[in-house]
């Protein structure tokens, strides 16, 4: 910092300030008895850099204080006060206390409690997530400035309940919520709220995986599958544009992308060489495409096009070690990817990873097909032809080698059906519908419980609903058995969980030794990607041309729902749909912004242009 010495300013530094410790994961210690005016200062030494960094204006959306929460309960347990804010969120605690000089107050944070009512901090792993405040005399207010935590519960030690007031302050990037969804089912409304709250908790300058444990990193796989839901709910332009700059900067010369951007910790684990990683690296294609469809800005496609090409070419390389049609199957060892990550139908991490042949092959089919579309948009006709052919050959390899040729997987699991159905990999609609019927039968045998991991979860309801299995889709959406979206709601979740079985019906975490080292987060937005289905099929609104220049309203009725509403912000203004059913009557109200056109399709199949 600069200190004034008469008319002369010198750059001076000190280690004697009130912030005694500050760490991203471990928290902050602040001593209010220390004054900077009495600190020992010394002149700063100018560093001679070997590089010439380019200074740029801050590009992204600033992290700011937003919602605040007051505790819903406080219980004395031993020497600690246990507060429940009633809501899981990312942020800090604002402490107002009447204290004595030198009095030490310690605040610890957690998402869940142990059965005895104490904080469960085991799932934080190495993160201490602790804020410590040393009081000056009198009444004072403090909150950490150089860290943040993810939590619902806190323990406060070193002060009496009557002398302290605590407030939860939610922190996230300054993104505007521009979309909304609601319907006649209150559990679905709570699910939508949980999706939004989890997204906010993880939009912390970069799209993180979770806000509480010793990660909080820009995992590419999470935002890859969640981006379509994100752009329905928020204005994501500045936030994602900034992160995509990081993606471009982090791309390897070989074309692969780190698993976390910016690279930190798990960028490439020791078990994984620096290669293309299916679905995780796909973020460089899926995220810009979601932005483009929401806003119609071709600039994001143009900026990311070289990155996309290098990445898809890298995927083609890693997928090409076989002979014949096997040259288009992603047959790498499971340990070199994530496969069907956190699929609840198999218990071990190695089993999730072992499905990489199915998920990786579908990934290459999808990214090359999207890249062909993008090449057409950008006028790169030869590229479009090349990547379209690559996608078609990959789809053919999947269907020829992994299915019986008539819509049945040789090895059946939900994601293995979902991806080729949703991505139109089957050669005919008839075969696709047979595959959807097989998927529905598989889901029914599983009591309509979800069995998909990261790659399949965003698309399973579309795969069913759009291929003659509407009832099956609604059975899965509205199921309250574990694992399911609404089981979490029934269990009291206020955000989206990383693991479908994060808590049993007694409020106890059943996660055993599955190879993930206590990997359980209760604020992890990835499976909230179902929000895309809530907007596009339940409410029935989706763009048919980038930026909603033209869009479709086509509600798919089911599940006993009697009404739904959705609003989205388009470049032309707000577009919305409100529908209701009563007896034999269906009423729909559509708001069409000036300069756009809407195709409305009623449940009886009749259509008109608005």
Q: What is each stretch, according to the model?
A:
Residues 1, 7-213, 221-222, 238-241, ...:
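Extracellular/oxidizing-compartment recognition motifs
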Residues 11-33, 54-67, 389, 393, ...:
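Non-catalytic C-terminal accessory modules of carbohydrate-active enzymes
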Residues 82-84, 144, 207-220, 268-281, ...:
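Solvent-exposed loop and edge beta-strand segments that line ligand/cofactor-binding
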Residues 92-111, 146, 157, 222-251, ...:
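Alpha-helical support elements that line or immediately flank enzyme active sites
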Residues 163-194, 198-201, 207-225, 229-260, ...:
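Active-site acid/base region of carbohydrate-active enzymes
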Residues 219-231, 237-242, 278-290, 357-372, ...:
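Well-ordered alpha-helical segments within folded domains of soluble proteins
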Residues 404, 408-512, 516-518:
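Extracellular polysaccharide-recognition and catalytic grooves
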């Amino acid at each position: 910092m600069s200190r004034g010495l008469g008319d002369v300013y010198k750059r001076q530094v000190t280690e004697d300030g009130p912030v005694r410790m500050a760490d991203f994961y471990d928290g902050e210690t602040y001593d209010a008895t220390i004054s900077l005016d009495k600190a020992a200062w010394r002149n700063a030494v100018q560093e001679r850099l070997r590089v010439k960094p380019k200074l740029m204006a801050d590009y992204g959306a600033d992290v700011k204080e937003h919602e605040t929460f007051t505790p819903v309960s406080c219980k004395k347990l031993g020497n600690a006060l246990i507060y429940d804010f009633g809501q899981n969120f990312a942020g800090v605690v604002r402490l107002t206390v009447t204290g004595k000089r030198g009095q030490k107050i310690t605040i610890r944070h957690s998402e869940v409690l142990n059965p005895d009512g104490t904080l469960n901090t085991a799932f934080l792993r190495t993160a201490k997530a602790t804020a410590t405040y040393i009081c000056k005399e009198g009444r004072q207010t403090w909150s950490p400035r150089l860290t943040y935590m993810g939590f619902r519960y806190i323990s406060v030690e070193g002060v009496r309940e009557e002398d302290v007031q605590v407030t939860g302050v939610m922190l996230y990037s300054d993104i505007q919520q521009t979309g909304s969804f609601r319907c006649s089912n209150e559990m679905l409304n709570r699910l939508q709220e949980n999706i939004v709250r989890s997204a906010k908790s993880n939009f912390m300058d970069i799209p993180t995986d979770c806000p509480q444990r010793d990660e909080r990193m820009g995992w590419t796989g999470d935002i890859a599958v969640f981006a379509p839901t994100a752009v329905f709910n928020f204005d994501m332009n500045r936030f994602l544009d900034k992160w995509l700059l990081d993606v471009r900067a982090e791309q390897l010369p070989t074309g692969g992308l780190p698993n976390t951007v910016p690279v930190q910790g798990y960028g490439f684990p020791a078990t994984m060489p620096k290669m293309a990683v299916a679905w995780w690296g796909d973020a460089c294609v899926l995220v810009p495409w979601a932005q483009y469809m929401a806003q119609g800005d071709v600039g994001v496609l143009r900026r990311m096009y070289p990155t996309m090409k290098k990445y898809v070419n890298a995927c083609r390389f890693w997928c090409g070690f076989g002979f014949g049609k096997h040259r288009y199957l992603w047959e790498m060892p499971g340990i070199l990817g994530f496969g069907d990550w956190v699929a609840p139908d198999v218990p071990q991490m190695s089993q999730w990873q072992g499905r990489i042949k199915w998920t990786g092959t579908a990934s290459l089919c999808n990214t090359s097909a999207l890249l062909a579309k993008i090449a057409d948009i950008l006028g790169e006709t030869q590229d479009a032809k090349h990547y379209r052919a690559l996608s078609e050959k990959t789809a053919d390899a999947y269907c020829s080698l992994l299915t019986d040729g008539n819509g049945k997987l040789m090895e059946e699991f939900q994601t293995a059906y979902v991806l080729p159905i949703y991505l139109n990999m089957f050669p005919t609609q008839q075969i696709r519908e047979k595959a959807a019927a097989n998927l529905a039968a598989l889901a029914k045998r599983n009591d309509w419980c979800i069995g998909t991991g990261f790659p399949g979860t965003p698309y399973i309801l579309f795969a069913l609903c759009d291929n003659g299995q509407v009832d099956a889709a609604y059975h899965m959406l509205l199921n309250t058995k574990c694992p399911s979206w609404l089981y979490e709601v029934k269990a009291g979740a206020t955000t989206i969980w990383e693991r479908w079985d994060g808590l049993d019906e007694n409020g106890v975490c059943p996660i055993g030794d599955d190879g993930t080292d206590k990997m359980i987060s209760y604020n992890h937005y990835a499976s909230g990607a179902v929000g895309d289905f809530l907007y596009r099929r339940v409410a029935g609104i989706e763009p048919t041309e980038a930026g909603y220049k033209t869009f479709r309203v086509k509600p798919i009725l089911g599940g006993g729902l009697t009404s739904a509403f959705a609003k989205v912000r388009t470049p032309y203004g707000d577009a919305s749909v409100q529908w209701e059913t009563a007896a034999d009557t269906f009423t729909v109200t559509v708001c069409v912004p000036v300069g756009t056109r809407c195709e409305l399709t009623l449940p009886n199949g009749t259509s008109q242009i608005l």
